[in-house]
Curated annotation (Swiss-Prot):
The lineage of its organism: Eukaryota, Fungi, Fungi incertae sedis, Mucoromycota, Mucoromycotina. Residues 196-198 form a propeptide. The gene is RAS2. One of its GO terms (biological process) is signal transduction. It is found in: Cell membrane. Its EC number is 3.6.5.2. This is Ras-like protein 2.
Amino acid sequence: MSTKGAAFLKEYKIVMVGDGGVGKSAMTIQFIQSTFVDEYDPTIEDSYRKQCLIDSECAMLDILDTAGQEEYSAMRERFMRNGEGFVLIYSITSYHTFEQVQKLHEQIARVKDLEHFPMVLVGNKCDLEQDRQVPTSAGRDLAKQYNCQFFEASAKQNVRIQDAFHGLVREIRRSQQEKCKKQKQYDEKQASLCCIVM
């Protein structure tokens, strides 16, 4: 790629959010490296980058894998402030993690001072159907409440992992286009007010 082409590569800041052990790191590494990491090693903070072609547009995904443990809540808020889009993850094998996702959603909304922000909801570990505690319908209903896309995924089997990340980039793009449109309308309204005053 030429340096001129690289200068126009749009970067998207994505934050992985969910309780400890839901598979945030496994999902991220599966997306970045097409590898499943079996052992659980609690993350404090890891950052990954991947260039993708999404809907014929190049995108650089800057993915921040955050700590799920409560003691890192203050650090997580800093990441939330800077994130453009969020992958909210729970494990279908743990209802507690589903409840935590709702608390994390509230935390993001408070930190960003926004009711709606680009996000996708992911029920991970769909390969463990025999251990399911969270019905698919509960995830679907929560996503409808949040007005976001919902995916049941498996980091282990690489099921719908790419769909979730690409879906989030589409949401970020849509949100940015809406902001630009509103700003343009506001600017035009201000310009017309200036003309009237003169």
